[in-house]
């Protein structure tokens, strides 16, 4: 039993300090543990494979249900990712390219000029009777040098959990000076008590308000501890869902980034995931080139899932989630896109109507990292994403294998209680000084 516990502890990634305390016993029982490991490892591999299949099947089922319910507005690409039906995004098209598209029956909508990012996007509607896949193929044949892609959909990477709300958080606002931070998500309930004291500016949906569970929960963790906001925090919230159950689209996310760039918001949280997309990729790269720091959830599709975006784009800070015992969530994505970890389970967060609910997922770990990054940036406004990542990593506690790894990245960032203790002892100031001294 002890040997099995040791093997499982190693698999779950105990902190190095705990492993070091067990080292003499491990050496004494090495022959036994090695034998058990040979027996246990295949079982763990099969369990992980079963989990991956279950998560993949669940996501496929969710997508099929959405497609069945909203077939009038949804379609799929060649990899079965959900897209806006009949819509193709042309990135900086030439006049000749647009003329060819019109001649083939496409209708071009008003260009979206994202001047703050230096981008122009023209949505094109496919001719009647032509599928979205056929539309993409047609445009790429008509204009091989042009850039055309689907308008992919992006959804949250976490949700509510069952059970009543406990007392896991203190209800005390985060320490330190107020920070400025951006959010691209679903709608936020600005009247929620958990956001009282925060300064909220909103964008999207033609000014209409669509408070949503996911956006409100993420916002409450971005400006405070989920139950109370740090007074004076400025939250710039872009609603790219607008009440639609299908999620946000690539065009909306790009426009949200452009608005945040226009507002000179340097740190942005993106707790949404989806496939690679040419427009989103260019928008993310343009934002980063202009000094913005993007923090994104890595997703909950399981350890074997392909990297999800935008977290997998270069220089985006990808965040995974652990439980209160520092164990990575089984459903969390793994890979090179994982930069940091934060607690993302058994958290209390705000939901519309003045309510609170427990939440789980990488969606709710990412705002902890984004809030820390915003605080550090307030100390050194000229720091870039690499410098901030280095400062965050300096605060992080290494988990799993020594050094950066595909499960925990560079380690677990401090929780609010840890931050308060660090602030009182000078630890946070030390991290800020590392940002100031970064090249």
Summary of predicted features, one role per range:
Residues 12-17:
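N-terminal signal peptide c-region/cleavage motif recognized by signal peptidases
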Residues 116-123, 130-194, 407, 423, ...:
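Protease zymogen maturation seam
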Residues 240, 344-419:
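Hydrolase catalytic cores
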Residues 22-27, 241-313, 325-328, 354-360, ...:
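Substrate-binding/access-modulating region of protease and related hydrolase catalytic domains
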Residues 184, 188-201, 321-363:
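Catalytic-core environment of secreted peptidases
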Residues 22-150, 155-156, 266-267, 426, ...:
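Inhibitory N-terminal propeptides of secreted protease zymogens
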Residues 18-21, 164-165:
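Boundary of Sec targeting at the N-terminus
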Residues 171-180, 188-200, 207-251, 313-314, ...:
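Subtilisin-like serine protease catalytic core
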